[in-house]
Amino acid sequence: MDPAASPAAAPPAAPAAAPAADPAADPAAALPGQALAQAPALAQINGQEGARNERAAYLWRPWLSSINDQPRQARSLVDWADNRATAAEAAKTDSDFHHPVRLYWPKSHSFDYLYSAGEILLNNFPVQATINLYEDSDSADNEEDKEEEEEEEEEEDDEEEEEDEDKDVNENEPEVCMGVSEATTHKATAHSPDPHSACPN
C-alpha cells in the first residue's frame, strides 16, 4: 500500500511543530495563573463576595455575567487594564441592559399596547422585557374628563326626559276653550301659570 495514497494513515502533526502562541494576542492564555489570581475580582464583579456571603454565590442573577465564563472575563479584565477603564465603565460597555428589563408605558396608552404597539415593541426589543404601566398626567386628566362628560350626559338626558314629558302632557290635554272671547282669553292668560294655554281652567 502506498503511504502517499492514504491520507488517513498519515501521523498527526506533532505538538512541537505547532506555532507558538503569541502572548500579546491572547493575554489570558499567556498568563494562566493570572486568571486564577483574578478570580476574587471576578467574584466581586459578579456580585459574589466569596467566603463572606456564601449564600449569594448560589443565587442565579441573570443580569450579571456567569462565573463559569472566566476566560472571557479574564480577557475583559486585561483589556480594561490596558485601556485604563474602570470596572463600572467596563460593565456598562459589556451590556447595555441589566435584567430584569422593564419598559414603562403610560396607562393612557394601555389600549394601544393591548392591540398593536406594545406587542410590536416587545417582539422587536432585543432582550426579554416586561411592560409596566404607570399613571401619567394624561390618564388622570382623561379620567376626570370622562367623569365630567358622563355627568353632563346624565344632566342632558334628564332635561330631555323632562321636555318629553311636558310635550306628552300638553299633547294629551284637550283644548276646551276654543270659542272664548279675547277679553276672557286675556284675563285667563294673566292668571294662567302656562302662557300657552288659552283656557281659564
From Swiss-Prot:
Region (Disordered): 1-29, 136-201
Main localization category: nucleus
Disulphide-bonded residues: none
Keywords: Developmental protein, Nucleus, Repressor, Transcription, Transcription regulation
Classification via InterPro entries: Ripply_fam
Region (Ripply homology domain): 99-134
Short sequence motif WRPW motif: positions: 57-60
Locations listed in the record: Nucleus
Gene Ontology annotations of biological process type: bone morphogenesis; embryonic pattern specification; negative regulation of DNA-templated transcription; Notch signaling pathway; regulation of gene expression; somite rostral/caudal axis specification; somite specification
Residue runs in coiled coils: none
Tissues in which the protein is found: Expressed in the anterior presomitic mesoderm and somites of stage E9.5 dpc embryos. Also expressed in tongue, diaphragm and intercostal muscles at 16.5 dpc.
Biased composition (Low complexity): 15-29
Acidic residues bias: start-end ranges: 136-174
GO CC, any one term: nucleus
Entry similarity comment: Belongs to the ripply family.
Functional note: Plays a role in somitogenesis. Essential for transcriptional repression of the segmental patterning genes, thus terminating the segmentation program in the presomitic mesoderm, and also required for the maintenance of rostrocaudal polarity in somites.
Domain notes: The ripply homology domain is required for transcriptional repression. The WRPW motif is required for binding to TLE/GROUCHO proteins.
Protein's name in the database: Protein ripply1
Gene name per UniProt: Ripply1
